[in-house]
């Protein structure tokens, strides 16, 4: 689970493209806080701080407390824009999150213990179908990732959502029993198996 992190911001009295450009020239990143049936609050963040925070990882699944000139806002990032050439942040959107609220987030899928799979050690391939999945969870308990244990995985094994144990209070968001990955034999072995099956069918 990711811990609540703190950010400092200042109120941005003017909105619009011109005001946003002025903030960037001053070394700040424009942002907005919205949601919870309250008026949006336009803010700006220190460029170095928010750039480092974004590239530290798990940004969109981290709960933040933003101090805006002494007023604290509990939020989760919903989107951010990067410069298409230099990849530095241009704008960030934050969603207000009340105490005990449930949020929908996308988290990465991590495949563990590939070295403990006989099939993968013998040259098989892990065919990853889903690199990320959506979860519904308490804002205070967002998993950093979903983990799939490949220990003992053999050729033809398929890993589904239903086989993954989630933390208490966390559920899949709008999924059926989707496939996450399959273990595929090397092409030569797969071709040989297909030929054997065809010969057996003729017999």
Swiss-Prot record:
<dbReference type="InterPro" id="IPR029751">
    <property type="entry name" value="Ribosomal_L25_dom"/>
</dbReference>
<dbReference type="GO" id="GO:0008097">
    <property type="term" value="F:5S rRNA binding"/>
</dbReference>
<protein>
    <recommendedName>
        <fullName>Large ribosomal subunit protein bL25</fullName>
    </recommendedName>
</protein>
<dbReference type="Pfam" id="PF01386">
    <property type="entry name" value="Ribosomal_L25p"/>
</dbReference>
<keyword id="KW-0694">RNA-binding</keyword>
<dbReference type="GO" id="GO:0006412">
    <property type="term" value="P:translation"/>
</dbReference>
<keyword id="KW-0689">Ribosomal protein</keyword>
<dbReference type="GO" id="GO:0022625">
    <property type="term" value="C:cytosolic large ribosomal subunit"/>
</dbReference>
<comment type="function">
    <text>This is one of the proteins that binds to the 5S RNA in the ribosome where it forms part of the central protuberance.</text>
</comment>
<keyword id="KW-0687">Ribonucleoprotein</keyword>
<dbReference type="InterPro" id="IPR020930">
    <property type="entry name" value="Ribosomal_uL5_bac-type"/>
</dbReference>
<comment type="subunit">
    <text>Part of the 50S ribosomal subunit; part of the 5S rRNA/L5/L18/L25 subcomplex. Contacts the 5S rRNA. Binds to the 5S rRNA independently of L5 and L18.</text>
</comment>
<dbReference type="InterPro" id="IPR037121">
    <property type="entry name" value="Ribosomal_bL25_C"/>
</dbReference>
<keyword id="KW-0699">rRNA-binding</keyword>
<comment type="similarity">
    <text>Belongs to the bacterial ribosomal protein bL25 family. CTC subfamily.</text>
</comment>
<dbReference type="GO" id="GO:0003735">
    <property type="term" value="F:structural constituent of ribosome"/>
</dbReference>
<dbReference type="Pfam" id="PF14693">
    <property type="entry name" value="Ribosomal_TL5_C"/>
</dbReference>
<dbReference type="InterPro" id="IPR001021">
    <property type="entry name" value="Ribosomal_bL25_long"/>
</dbReference>
<dbReference type="InterPro" id="IPR020057">
    <property type="entry name" value="Ribosomal_bL25_b-dom"/>
</dbReference>
<dbReference type="InterPro" id="IPR011035">
    <property type="entry name" value="Ribosomal_bL25/Gln-tRNA_synth"/>
</dbReference>
<dbReference type="InterPro" id="IPR020056">
    <property type="entry name" value="Rbsml_bL25/Gln-tRNA_synth_N"/>
</dbReference>
């Amino acid at each position: 689970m990711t811990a609540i992190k703190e950010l400092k911001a200042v109120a941005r009295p003017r909105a619009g493209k011109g005001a946003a450009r002025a903030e960037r020239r001053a070394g700040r990143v424009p942002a907005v806080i919205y949601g919870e049936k309250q008026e949006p609050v336009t803010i700006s963040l220190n460029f170095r701080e928010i750039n480092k925070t974004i590239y530290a990882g798990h940004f969109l699944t981290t709960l933040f407390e933003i101090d805006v000139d002494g007023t604290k806002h509990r939020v989760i990032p919903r989107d951010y824009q990067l410069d298409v050439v230099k990849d530095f942040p241009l704008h960030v959107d934050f969603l207000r999150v009340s105490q005990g609220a449930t949020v929908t987030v996308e988290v990465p899928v991590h495949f563990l213990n590939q070295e403990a799979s006989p099939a993968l050690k013998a040259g098989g391939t892990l065919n990853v179908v889903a690199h990320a999945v959506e979860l519904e969870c308490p804002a205070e308990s967002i998993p950093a990732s979903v983990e799939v244990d490949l220990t003992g995985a053999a050729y033809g094994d398929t890993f589904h959502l239903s086989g993954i144990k989630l933390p208490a209070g966390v559920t899949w968001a709008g999924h059926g029993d989707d496939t996450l990955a399959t273990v595929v034999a090397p092409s030569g072995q797969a071709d040989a198996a297909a030929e054997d099956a065809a010969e057996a069918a003729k017999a």
